[in-house]
Amino acid sequence: MVNFGGATENDRKKIVITKDSKAFFHNNVDYCVGTGRMGLALTEEYQEELRLVQKEIGFKHIRGHGLFCDDMAIFQTYEEDGKVRVEYNYTYLDRVMDAYKKVGLRPFLELGFMPKKLASGSQTIFYWQGNTTPPKDYDMWCNMVHSLLRHLMERYGEEEVIQWPIEVWNEPNLCGFWENADMQEYFKLFHRTFDAIKEVNPGFRVGGPAVCGGTDEKWIQAFMEYCHENHIPVDFVTRHHYTIDPPECIGHYAYS
């Protein structure tokens, strides 16, 4: 039981399940499909496979890594009059979003990873080197989130975009995805990002911590407590459905 907001033993609900018990099954298997990095959707081969997936299954949402990675080229800096200035380029993002829209998919936005020029460190993950360190400037990060959402609403309409769930980062409880798996630093990122999103439109649904196995119970408990103590009305809580135990490793392959 997750103790959120001072829940007590009296708040527990006892459920008895017998072999004859029946209940409605909320089948969410087609709610969202995971993909690799978002930049893959820029290729024709990927889009062909996506059309096939939608024809055969028909998912509602799609979630992928690397929205803010350098291959998407959103975060750009240049020097003018002796000052470093920031601008945002959405050319590739628009192509990806358009590809999703053509096959009837809505994005499940995962905000990450860190643009190299905004990163506080050099740690990366995967061959495409997604930076997994906190922002060196949280104000610049929040400005980037602001700009992203405003652009999406301008292009696809406010009523459409607020139906896209937003998740802050990916699996911060794993050192590879978040430097040192620093829980408090992630909570800071979530808090600042949550506020930034709601400033654009309070109708956006924002969630986390998007954890994966192992320490998930500890993280979710702490996350809920942090949200309660800091008056963050989180819209949903996510945990990725992998094994609880560490995977068995044979050579460089891991099996769950």
Task: Name every feature range the model reports, one short phrase each.
Residues 1-4, 252-256:
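Short intrinsically disordered, low-complexity coil segments enriched in acidic
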Residues 1-60, 64-65:
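Mature N-terminal, pre-catalytic/accessory segment of carbohydrate-active enzymes
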Residues 57-255:
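Substrate-binding cleft and catalytic face of glycoside hydrolase catalytic domains
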